[in-house]
Amino acid sequence: MYTLLKQEGRAKRARLETVHGTIETPVFMNVGTVAAIKGAVSTTDLHEIKTQVELSNTYHLHVRPGDHIIKQLGGLHKFMNWDRPILTDSGGFQVFSLAKLRKIKEEGVYFNSHIDGRKIFMGPEESMQIQSNLGSTIAMAFDECPSSVASREYVQASVDRTTRWLQRCKDEMARLNSLEDTVNPHQLLFGINQGAIYDDIRIAHAETISQMNLDGYAIGGLAVGETHEEMYRILDSVVPHLPVDKPTYLMGVGTPANILEAVSRGVDFFDCVYPSRNGRHGHVYTNSGKINLFNAKYELDSRPIEEGCQCPACRHYSRAYIRHLLKAKEMLGMRLCVLHNLYFYNTMMEEIRDALDQGCFEEYKNRKLEGMQAKK
């Protein structure tokens, strides 16, 4: 059950009760594509860095190790030893962006595995079946993510097909949740708004899917090449047409500034690979902006990455030491940077929730954005 606790302007402070625990929103979901966050991060670590929700990928887990194997082992939560909510994306984005030789038809998509080249078919029913086998807390509907440079005619046809696929997802999810051997009979389903950069197509699609009584609504197809200004314009157009009493999820976004701007526009679920990907390359977030620990100026820097930060890296190690590890290609350096970045994001979300509770989010947002422009 989703409870809207407070609003400041369009910004939402809410709570989603799930079978795997409570999600306080706005929330940043930590991305563990193949049931692990890249950077040697364990589920024990995730507890320590204040992770509420882990996100895994349907396509990748279907290809390897196989969703039927995970089901036989009791579902994804048992498989990875994680006792909090998991969201699985539908696999659609990977099918359309990674897979070669794809062929889109009304029934679904034919494509070749990126691992062994074998031919795979995935449609709405197959995506729901895979996610049901995984037993995630939240399943995402199967959709097509049209390119931001696709023609208006193509985008409209794609969105219409995505709407038809969404109804099939909903029907199949209801069937799967009623089966005796299902891993999670309380699995939630989020639909996805598409429409590339065409505001009117997105608005019409948002209004259509809002009538389908889903558990949550995502905005997909952003952060794939359009400018930040275009993204914010689309959010301004679309979010008012989605139910305020349901989760609003902006997929694949983004930077701390993106998140702050999107929260102010009514979004309360986020995910992005930035904190872990940047961390693996020595780029770490601070309240004064992002820094590159490979830079020579940190060679003798005995300070933690961020003064006052309580992450495992900042509590115990200096910038100079972590820089040394990165230069020596020691895995610990990468791991410490990833842990710090995820902790930074999770802590920022905590601060956003506190600011909304206190009715001072706009002030917090402006102060945070101004601070991140500073040089360190």
Predicted features and spans:
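C-terminal extensions of enzymes
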Residues: 1-15, 23-32, 39-40, 143-149, ...
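Non-catalytic, usually N-terminal nucleic-acid engagement modules in DNA/RNA processing proteins
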Residues: 1-183, 296-299
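Conserved, mostly hydrophobic/aromatic
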Residues: 21, 54, 89, 131, ...
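Hydrophobic alpha-helical packing residues
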Residues: 21, 162-169, 209, 238, ...
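Non-membrane alpha-helical structural segments and their capping/turn regions in soluble enzymes
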Residues: 121, 125, 152, 156-163, ...
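Glycine- and acidic
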Residues: 147-152, 156, 216-222, 331-334
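Glycine-rich phosphate/ribose-binding loops and adjacent secondary-structure elements
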Residues: 163, 172, 176, 184, ...
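Surface-exposed helix-capping loop/turn segments at secondary-structure junctions
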Residues: 172-182, 246, 352-364
